[in-house]
Amino acid sequence: MIIPDINLLLYAVITGFPQHRRAHAWWQDTVNGHTRIGLTYPALFGFLRIATSARVLAAPLPTADAIAYVREWLSQPNVDLLTAGPRHLDIALGLLDKLGTASHLTTDVQLAAYGIEYDAEIHSSDTDFARFADLKWTDPLRE
C-alpha cells in the first residue's frame, strides 16, 4: 500500500505547479493501477485547505471542485480511507519526541504514523520524510 502526501495530490491537480505533468501522470497511473492506495484525513483535508486557498495559489480551486476530486479518488476500487488505529497516537507522539520539534513537521508525523501503522510506503516529494528511520518512503517524481 502507498500513502500519498498532500504535495503530490496538489501537484497532480493544480496545473500551475512545475511538477504538475509528472505528478498528474504518476497519480493517474497509480489510481488506475492495482496498487492499494491509502488516503488519510490529514492528507485529504490538507489538500482541501491548500487547493482552495487564495493566500497560497493564484488560481485556487472552487471548494466544490476540490471536494469532487476527493470524492472521485475515494470512489476508486483500489483506494481506502485509512483511519487511525489504536497505536497511531503513540507512534506519532514518539516520532515527535525523537524529532524534538513539532511545528511544521506535525502533518508529516501524522502521515508517517499512518505509514508505520499500516506498513505502507509514503509517496512524497518532501525529503523531511527521510527523518523517520522506521518509515518506508519514496519520491515518485524524482528523476
Swiss-Prot record:
InterPro entries: Mtu_PIN, PIN-like_dom_sf, PIN_dom, VapC_family. Belongs to the PINc/VapC protein family. Toxic component of a type II toxin-antitoxin (TA) system. An RNase. Upon expression in M.smegmatis inhibits colony formation. Its toxic effect is neutralized by coexpression with cognate antitoxin VapB33. It is an enzyme of class 3 (hydrolase). GO terms for biological process: negative regulation of growth. GO terms for molecular function: magnesium ion binding; RNA nuclease activity. HAMAP family: VapC_Nob1 (MF_00265). This is Ribonuclease VapC33. Its EC number is 3.1.-.-. Coiled coil: none annotated. The keyword Hydrolase applies. Pfam families: PIN (PF01850). Keywords: Hydrolase, Magnesium, Metal-binding, Nuclease, Toxin-antitoxin system. It comes from the Bacteria. The keyword Metal-binding applies. Mg(2+) binds at D5, D108. Its cofactor is Mg(2+). It comes from Mycobacterium tuberculosis (strain ATCC 25618 / H37Rv). GO terms for cellular component: plasma membrane.
